[in-house]
Swiss-Prot record:
<keyword id="KW-0238">DNA-binding</keyword>
<dbReference type="GO" id="GO:0006974">
    <property type="term" value="P:DNA damage response"/>
</dbReference>
<feature type="compositionally biased region" description="Low complexity">
    <location>
        <begin position="257"/>
        <end position="306"/>
    </location>
</feature>
<comment type="function">
    <text>Unique chromatin-associating protein that contributes to the organism's exceptional tolerance to harsh environmental stresses. Binds with a higher affinity to nucleosomes than to free DNA. Protects chromatin from damage caused by hydroxyl radical-mediated cleavage induced by X-rays or treatment with hydrogen peroxide. Suppresses X-ray-induced DNA damage that includes single-strand breaks (SSBs) as well as more hazardous double-strand breaks (DSBs), and improves radiotolerance. Also shields DNA against reactive oxygen species (ROS).</text>
</comment>
<feature type="compositionally biased region" description="Low complexity">
    <location>
        <begin position="117"/>
        <end position="138"/>
    </location>
</feature>
<feature type="region of interest" description="Required and sufficient for DNA-binding and co-localization with nuclear DNA">
    <location>
        <begin position="208"/>
        <end position="445"/>
    </location>
</feature>
<feature type="compositionally biased region" description="Polar residues">
    <location>
        <begin position="1"/>
        <end position="15"/>
    </location>
</feature>
<feature type="compositionally biased region" description="Low complexity">
    <location>
        <begin position="367"/>
        <end position="431"/>
    </location>
</feature>
<feature type="region of interest" description="Required for nucleosome binding and for the protection of chromatin from hydroxyl radical-mediated DNA damage">
    <location>
        <begin position="360"/>
        <end position="445"/>
    </location>
</feature>
<dbReference type="GO" id="GO:0005634">
    <property type="term" value="C:nucleus"/>
</dbReference>
<feature type="compositionally biased region" description="Basic and acidic residues">
    <location>
        <begin position="207"/>
        <end position="228"/>
    </location>
</feature>
<feature type="compositionally biased region" description="Low complexity">
    <location>
        <begin position="61"/>
        <end position="73"/>
    </location>
</feature>
<feature type="compositionally biased region" description="Polar residues">
    <location>
        <begin position="245"/>
        <end position="256"/>
    </location>
</feature>
<keyword id="KW-0227">DNA damage</keyword>
<feature type="region of interest" description="Disordered">
    <location>
        <begin position="1"/>
        <end position="145"/>
    </location>
</feature>
<dbReference type="GO" id="GO:0003677">
    <property type="term" value="F:DNA binding"/>
</dbReference>
<feature type="compositionally biased region" description="Gly residues">
    <location>
        <begin position="329"/>
        <end position="338"/>
    </location>
</feature>
Length: 445
């Protein structure tokens, strides 16, 4: 019976085992370091499915489990340390995969109980990678069916008899079979899918998070989302496993293998532009520093004029000019931004450095010169306004008239208005009424 079953299911088994590897690799593990790891988990998932369904039916999935004998060991490492798991997996999965064909007949596996136990232990999982090939061998598939039956029996009572009979590997492998083997829903046959669903969440919560973190460290954080998306889809690891190993991004991208490497390539360019922008911004900052020193020289107007109001006006003018000077610096920065794209940033930055208003856009420079004395630079305009105000008689009204340096004029006007309002406040404000006895009396009535 087993042989007939096998022959009938064999093509599907080969095809399916292939899919299984791929899907499994993605579903459970691909987030973990390498595609190889992924394969390992995937295959383990396959074998788990086998454990539940394959033994009784002798389907291709069972074939898969039987054929792969290595991964069990990898799994033994997996629960503790995903990193070592991935590295071990590459070597182990590869070597055992070769071993199975080298063994020639998997009959030896089926016949020898120790090997069948090893399969139950999850070693078989490792080979599930190559299960597609091995299953094509009818003799192997027969032996595999026998092995799978043992596996199923062991898996039903995982903690019990299988552990006793199997070698030391069995202990860890059994846990792996419980936790990891059934992780992939899509890989498992419909009968095992319910079990797989339960295990998938638990497995991802434990292993998936670790692998995500690992990816984040290696590939700068994008991976976290990608790997989650990839875990569900069956295509990420399919045909481009080698690519996945090299780029690391194709692995976890949600099935769009071509797009992910493109992302990586595109990412290389913006940093160069950002460097240019940063340089330009530094130049702009230097320009605004120069402007600030100019604005501080305009503060000299404060001390020279004895009038407090005037000093206030001139200092306000200085702060205003500093703002406009900062815009000069901004112009320099934006110029250098353009330079990052067109190569012209450096000249603009230098001009702004020198405090030359010609570096500004024409609109800004015209505004500055018209508000000041006509001198080209902002600090000079501030100085001119302050000097003229200081030389005039220091009454507030004269200061207001004479402080013609744009911002200074407005500041003086504001200052006089505030003074007059303050002087009137005692007569008009609520405080006056409270003080006056009659007013207070009336209010009480």
């Amino acid at each position: 019976m087993a042989s007939t079953h096998q022959s009938s299911t064999e093509p599907s088994s080969t095809g399916k085992s292939e899919e299984t590897k791929k899907d499994a690799s993605q579903g459970s593990g691909q987030d973990s370091k390498n595609v190889t790891v992924t394969k390992g988990t995937g295959s383990s998932a396959t074998s788990a499915a086998i454990v539940k369904t394959g033994g009784s039916q002798g389907k291709d999935s069972s074939t898969t489990a039987g054929s792969s004998s290595t991964q069990g060991q990898k799994f033994s490492t997996t629960p503790t340390d995903p990193k070592t798991f991935s590295s071990d997996q590459k070597e182990k999965s590869k070597s055992p995969a070769k071993e199975v064909p080298s063994g020639g007949d998997s009959k030896s596996q089926g016949d020898t109980k120790s090997q069948s136990d090893a399969k139950s232990s999850g070693q078989s999982q490792g080979q599930s990678k190559d299960s597609g090939k091995s299953s094509s061998d009818s003799s192997k598939s027969h032996s595999v069916i026998g092995a799978v039956k043992d596996v199923v029996a062991g898996a039903k009572d995982v903690a019990g008899k299988a552990v006793e009979d199997a070698p030391s590997i069995m202990h860890t492998a059994v846990d792996a079979v419980k936790n990891a083997a059934t992780t992939v829903k899509d890989v498992a046959s419909s009968a095992a899918s319910t079990v797989a669903e339960k295990v998938v969440d638990a497995y991802h919560s434990v292993v998936g998070d670790k692998t995500d973190d690992k990816k984040e460290g290696e590939h700068s954080g994008d991976k976290k989302d990608d790997s989650k998306a990839g875990s569900g889809s069956g295509q990420g690891g399919d045909n481009k496993k080698s690519e996945g190993e090299t780029s690391g991004q194709a692995e976890s991208s949600s099935g769009n293998e071509g797009a992910a490497p493109a992302k990586g390539r595109g990412r290389g360019r913006p940093p160069a532009a950002a460097k240019g922008v940063a340089k330009g911004a530094a130049k702009g900052a230097a320009a605004s520093k120069g402007a600030k020193s100019g604005a501080e020289s305009s503060k000299g107007g404060e001390q020279s004029s004895g009038d407090i109001e005037m000093a206030d006006a001139s200092s306000k003018g200085g702060s205003d000019q500093r703002d406009s000077a900062a815009t000069v610096g901004e112009g320099g920065a934006s110029g250098s931004e353009g330079g990052a794209k067109k190569g012209r940033g450096r000249g603009a930055g230098k001009k702004a450095d020198a405090g030359d208003t010609s570096a500004e856009p024409p609109r800004r420079s015209s505004r500055l010169t018209s508000s000041g004395t006509g001198a080209g630079s902002a600090p000079a305009a501030a100085k001119g306004g302050a000097k003229r105000a200081a030389s005039s008689s220091s009454t507030p009204s004269n200061a207001k008239k004479q402080a013609t340096g744009g911002a200074g004029k407005a500041a003086a006007t504001k200052a006089t208005a505030a003074k007059s309002a303050a002087s009137k406040a005692p007569q008009n404000g609520a405080g006056a009424k409270k003080k006056g006895g009659k007013a207070g009396g009336r209010k009480r009535k």
